[in-house]
């Protein structure tokens, strides 16, 4: 056997080992992913909606120059599967200079669950946390949800999060998965 043949044999052997290693790695990832998926169902507490008293909830959405996404976000919030009489959507306009405020006002006129909170002049433009703290003064609900202006939650996300918060008295806050528009 020449050196070239020996080198090719070693290279072939290394290649085969790497291929099998990658296959085994993918298999392990799949198994653990499936186990995690099954665990998530165990951890979820499904709620009998007919016998569960959902808390009132205010959704706070701070927005500063978000004209490209705010309409879709508010529409997404209005589509949430949550008792309509217990939901308030407070959109915080933090000194936007684009058409964000006009878009919000269209929703305010069409649905009484949507409320516009304009950050007072001189107090705006100082960050998301400042806008949220100012808007907290008008919240009257039992629970508060905070979404960014470019978030579109799943239809049942708020219902699930609120139920977890109420059912587990040790929790003070819950965080769900989210997806953004931009």
Predicted regions, residues:
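Internal catalytic domains of large membrane-associated glycosyltransferases
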Residues: 42-182
């Amino acid at each position: 056997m020449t050196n070239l043949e020996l080198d090719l044999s070693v290279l072939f052997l290394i290649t085969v080992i790497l291929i099998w290693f990658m296959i085994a790695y993918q298999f392990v990832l799949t198994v653990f992913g499936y186990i995690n998926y099954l665990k998530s169902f165990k951890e979820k507490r499904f709620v009998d909606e007919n016998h569960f008293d959902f808390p009132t909830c205010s959704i706070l959405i701070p927005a500063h120059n978000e004209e490209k996404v705010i309409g879709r976000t508010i529409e997404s919030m209005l589509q949430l599967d949550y008792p309509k009489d217990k939901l308030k959507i407070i959109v915080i306009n933090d000194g936007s200079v684009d058409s964000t405020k006009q878009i919000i006002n269209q929703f305010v006129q069409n649905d009484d669950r949507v409320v516009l909170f304009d950050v007072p002049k001189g107090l705006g433009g100082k960050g998301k946390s400042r806008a949220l703290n100012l808007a907290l003064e008008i919240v009257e609900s039992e629970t508060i949800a905070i979404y960014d202006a470019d978030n579109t939650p799943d239809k049942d996300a708020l219902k699930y999060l609120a139920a977890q918060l109420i059912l587990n008295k040790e929790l003070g806050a819950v965080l769900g998965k989210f997806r953004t528009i931009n």
